[in-house]
């Protein structure tokens, strides 16, 4: 059984992942409009990955006997500047997401939930692997 504190923290991450998905999709639309179809395609792929993360987190909560929920997802911007500015925003956003995931691992550790720590470490590893791949 997952603790309420950890369940709430993961539910917040689900909402954050959905916001990230919407952000990358909006960036994709913007880049396509500007004529950068390759960048648009890559950003759309990132959007789908963030959506998949949200679903994976929700499934995990449910498997642990908890209640997954999606809170209101804030509106994302629709104008992003130059292609360089777009990718600077992507980088800054991914740094914030990495910190959020690290904080989730810390909550799982504080709750002495080793199964959740193991599950969440998969997201930590993915962030590191993606960083190394894109360098």
Placement of each model-derived feature along the sequence:
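DHp/HisKA dimerization-phosphoacceptor four-helix bundle of two-component histidine kinases
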Residues: 12-15, 19, 45-52, 89-96, ...
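Conserved alpha-helical segments that form or flank metal/cofactor-binding pockets of metalloenzymes
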Residues: 31-72
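Acidic interhelical loop/turn segments
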Residues: 32, 36, 72-79, 99-126
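Conserved small/polar residues in nucleotide/adenosyl-binding loops
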Residues: 133-135
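Acidic/His metal-coordination segments adjacent to aromatic residues that form catalytic metal sites
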Residues: 2-7, 72-92
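A structural feature that tracks compact, well-ordered secondary-structure segments
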Residues: 9-13, 18-25, 98-105
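Hydrophobic packing residues in well-ordered alpha-helices of helical domains and bundles
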Residues: 10, 43, 87-90, 101, ...
């Amino acid at each position: 059984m997952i603790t309420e504190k950890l369940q709430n923290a993961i539910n917040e991450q689900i909402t954050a992942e959905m916001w990230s998905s919407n952000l990358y999709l909006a960036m994709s639309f913007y880049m396509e409009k500007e004529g950068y179809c390759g960048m648009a395609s890559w950003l759309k792929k990132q959007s789908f990955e963030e959506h998949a993360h949200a679903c994976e987190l929700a499934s995990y909560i449910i498997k642990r006997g908890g209640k997954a929920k999606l809170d209101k997802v804030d509106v994302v911007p629709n104008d992003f500047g130059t292609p360089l500015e777009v990718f600077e925003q992507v980088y800054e956003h991914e740094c914030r997401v990495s910190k959020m995931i690290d904080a989730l691992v810390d909550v799982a550790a504080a709750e002495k939930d080793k199964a959740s720590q193991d599950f969440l470490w998969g997201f930590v590893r993915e962030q590191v692997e993606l960083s190394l791949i894109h360098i």
